[in-house]
Amino acid sequence: MLTRKIKLWDINAHITCRLCSGYLIDATTVTECLHTFCRSCLVKYLEENNTCPTCRIVIHQSHPLQYIGHDRTMQDIVYKLVPGLQEAEMRKQREFYHKLGLEVPGDIKGETCSAKQHLDPHRNGETKADDSSNKEAAEEKQEEDGDYHRSDEQVSICLECNSSKLRGLKRKWIRCSAQATVLHLKKFIAKKLNLSSFNELDILCNEEILGKDHTLKFVVVTRWRFKKAPLLLHYRPKMDLL
């Protein structure tokens, strides 16, 4: 079978962020036009704009952040195509925590180890079969440990209801992984309140509706950075945005 080698330079336009011109980190896609950017770059841009940076289509007149989503597939592709990018990003995050004198979250440590395990077999000339068996063994080990993200960086949250149409939670104080998303919280609240669908809810921070794919870590960094724990979030029945 014939193979064709392609230089990384030839596909750079497809795996770089138009806003910062760097390789995509925490890739986030606009649902209207499917253009992808770094999450931090896109969120910062949408604080002052409501159009796509590439095609200028209006994402939403008033709540554009509701119509962007984390693109895990694209991020995986970027990490696989660009040698050392994932390790470099994890190193930057570790240095950031060390600089602040904070403990490095378990999820960052785990991703670093995972990246090394993914790269080392190929450097040593091992076969793909060996790589697959190692991956399966690692997944089985993880299931046996039953950690359930307890070693991740944790976020303390207070979930308050600000609508008379819904009742408050009996236990409004929760603690969960910083990698959990707003969607996870919606499902949790819907289950506790016996709602027919989690899509019937909006979750807000500082009176701003949060996108379903926002991680709690992202919310803390962008909406709660200089405030004390717990992170205060409000929920209400979903309102149709015009």
Swiss-Prot record:
GO terms for molecular function: histone H2AK119 ubiquitin ligase activity; zinc ion binding. SUPFAM superfamilies: RING/U-box (SSF57850). Residues 115-149 are annotated as: Disordered. Keywords: Metal-binding, Nucleus, Repressor, Transcription, Transcription regulation, Zinc, Zinc-finger. A zinc finger (RING-type) spans 17-56. Its main location: nucleus. Residues 132-242 are annotated as: Interaction with BCORL1. One of its GO terms (cellular component) is PRC1 complex. Residues 117-140 have a biased composition (Basic and acidic residues). The keyword Repressor applies. It is found in: Nucleus; Nucleus, Nucleoplasm. Gene3D superfamilies: Phosphatidylinositol 3-kinase Catalytic Subunit, Chain A, domain 1, Zinc/RING finger domain, C3HC4 (zinc finger). Component of a Polycomb group (PcG) multiprotein PRC1-like complex, a complex class required to maintain the transcriptionally repressive state of many genes, including Hox genes, throughout development. PcG PRC1 complex acts via chromatin remodeling and modification of histones; it mediates monoubiquitination of histone H2A 'Lys-119', rendering chromatin heritably changed in its expressibility. Within the PRC1-like complex, regulates RNF2 ubiquitin ligase activity. Component of a PRC1-like complex that contains PCGF3, RNF2 and RYBP. Interacts with CBX6, CBX7 and CBX8. Interacts with BCORL1. This is Polycomb group RING finger protein 3. The lineage of its organism: Eukaryota, Metazoa, Chordata, Craniata, Vertebrata. The gene is PCGF3.
